[in-house]
Amino acid sequence: MAFFRDIKEDINVILEQDPAARTGLEILLCYPGIWALIWHKPAHWLYRHNMKMLARIISQLTRWFTGIEIHPGAVIGRRCFIDHGMAVVIGETAEVGDDVTIYQGVTLGGTGKDTGKRHPTIGNRVVISSGAKVLGPFKVGNDVKIGAGAVVLKEIPDGCTVVGIPGTIVRRHGKPARELNQVDMPDPIAVELECLRRRV
C-alpha cells in the first residue's frame, strides 16, 4: 500500500539525513515533521474528494499537535523531510517536489488575497533553510538551496543557491553567480559615515 511505503521512505530519509535520529521508533515518537506528513496524506485525500471541512479539521488538529501547518490542498512529494518543523507553513496551492528538506520557520505562502494559484511550486531535491520565506506563484527549480532567513519573491532556476532579502542568487551549479572583488564590496566606514550624516 502506497501510504505505508511513503511513511517508510520518510523514516528512512530522516535516518539518512539527521545524525541525531537513532531508530525508526524514535522518529515515529519524537519527530513532529513525520506526523505532520502522515496526517497530511488523509487530509489531502479528503480535500481532493470534496470533503474540505473534514480535511481542514484534520489539518488544524495536526497543526495544534505539531506546530506545523500544511493546508490540505497542498501537494507534497515523496521523501519530504520537515526537520525541527515548528512554525512551518505550507499554503493551499503550494506544490513540493520529491526529496525536499524544509527546516523550522519556513513559509511557502502567497503575497496577498489573490485567488487561484498563489503559492510556490518547489522542485525536487530542494533545501529550504530555517526562517526562509518563499512567497508567490512561481517555480523554484530542482537542486536549489535557499539560505536561512531568505525571502524569495521570484522564480529560481535549477541548481542555484539563494540568500538574503530579497533572495539573490549567489551560486549556480556550485559556482559563484558572479565574481566579487574588493571594488564590489561596500566600504563599512563609508556606510557608517553616511548613516551619521543622515542623522545630523
What are these regions (language model features)?
Residues 1-62, 66, 177-200:
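Terminal amphipathic alpha-helical/low-complexity segments used for targeting or macromolecular assembly
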